[in-house]
Regions:
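Bacterial N-terminal signal peptides
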Residues: 8-17
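Bacterial N-terminal signal peptides that target proteins for export
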Residues: 1-7
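Mature, structured domains of secreted/extracytosolic soluble proteins
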Residues: 20-184
Length: 184
């Protein structure tokens, strides 16, 4: 009887621990994202963000995004970069285009840790369209698409949907987006 009771409690404890392991941050690019790691430490493990990581390295922004922040990063997937006109990514990755690449990448970053609930509050307070100032200095507008998905609008009129939200990091938060947003 005692042995059976111990086994039951052990199995219950294992079930609770296993259930808790899956809670919290989502899986991005096939890998679990950890809130104890910084933006770069998590991003390098996402199979969906290899182009973004290569671009951050080419622009010299890795050290910045490993820093204390906090930062909110709207992180385009590889598929988002694939939507750009042919040759755009290769051109931006050339050393002579580092300034242009940095401008595009820092346009995807906002100072502070802005969660989905924060974005929704801003949208509501702004009558449906909230304005964010990026680290690059430009503006992004945040709205609700179909009443349930957060959508970004860039200075050129392009839009991106947040596909995975609230990927919390030790130095901020990542929101995965399906399109690269572009500054003026």
């Amino acid at each position: 009887m005692n042995r059976r009771l111990i086994l039951t409690f052990a199995l219950l404890a294992l079930a609770i621990t296993s259930a808790g392991a899956g809670m919290g941050n989502p899986v991005v690019g096939g890998k679990q994202m950890y809130p104890t790691k910084n933006i770069i430490e998590n991003a390098v493990h996402s199979a969906d963000h290899t182009t973004l990581v290569a671009a951050l390295k080419a622009a010299g922004l890795v050290e910045t995004l490993e820093g204390p922040g906090p930062f909110t990063v709207f992180a385009p997937t590889n598929g988002a970069f694939d939507k750009l006109p042919t040759g755009t990514v290769d051109t931006l990755l050339k050393p002579e285009n580092k300034a242009a690449l940095t401008k595009v990448l820092t346009y995807h970053v906002v100072s502070g840790r802005i969660s989905t609930s924060d974005l929704l509050k801003k949208i509501k307070q702004s009558n449906g369209s909230a304005e964010l100032t990026t680290v690059e200095g430009g503006k992004l507008w945040v709205t609700l698409h179909d009443g349930k998905h957060i959508m970004l609008k860039d200075e050129k009129g392009g839009t991106a949907l947040v596909t995975i939200a609230n990927v919390f990091q030790s130095n901020g938060v990542i929101h995965v987006i399906d399109t690269v947003v572009m500054p003026n």
